[in-house]
């Protein structure tokens, strides 16, 4: 597994690198924190571990840059005790988040879970769903409508798949949150709202503004 570890604390970087390599992960770091994307593009990681507090530009900046060109899984690290860091990471499409200090074995378990969820699923036979006049490719986390294509994060796609399989039915927030936890995604009531809002914004880009309806106090409904 190719891991890009974007961490400016050299002591922590070396400790994590040594531990990850014992699990046969191939780990690369950053030499110039103004050129993170150069290393990202040349190393082509399968997962990125991204610290929030970095010199020159913060981790949120680099997450945006990565999301412009890739859906690679991103796990954020942060030493700040600030819930908004977690919310921001979700808004930017991160796959997981850990607050420092943390147990290395928990980090490794999260990396393995992300890898299984992303790469073992995408290696399966292509799966598609038809919804309204759009085609949803579950293996690529994409939606195509006419000549327009949008890409979703793994969490957004799970939410959408749950709603579509129960079209014209109200799906409770608790049902969605439970499904996401079962899939080893990290989510709370607040981050579910963030993900649904981000999903709606992406759907609006292809003219599907009212495809998902909020049922106040009950949950969400995907219309036929």
Swiss-Prot record:
Posttranslational mods: Phosphorylated by GraS. Phosphorylated by Stk1; phosphorylation increases the DNA-binding activity of GraR.
Location relative to the cell: Cytoplasm
Domain Response regulatory: 2-115
GO molecular function annotation: phosphorelay response regulator activity; transcription cis-regulatory region binding
PROSITE patterns assigned to the protein according to its UniProt record, in alphabetical order: OMPR_PHOB, RESPONSE_REGULATORY
CDD domains: REC_OmpR_NsrR-like (cd18159), trans_reg_C (cd00383)
Keywords: Activator, Antibiotic resistance, Cytoplasm, DNA-binding, Phosphoprotein, Repressor, Transcription, Transcription regulation, Two-component regulatory system, Virulence
PANTHER family: REGULATOR OF RPOS, SENSORY TRANSDUCTION PROTEIN BCER
Protein name: Response regulator protein GraR
Source organism: Staphylococcus aureus (strain MRSA252)
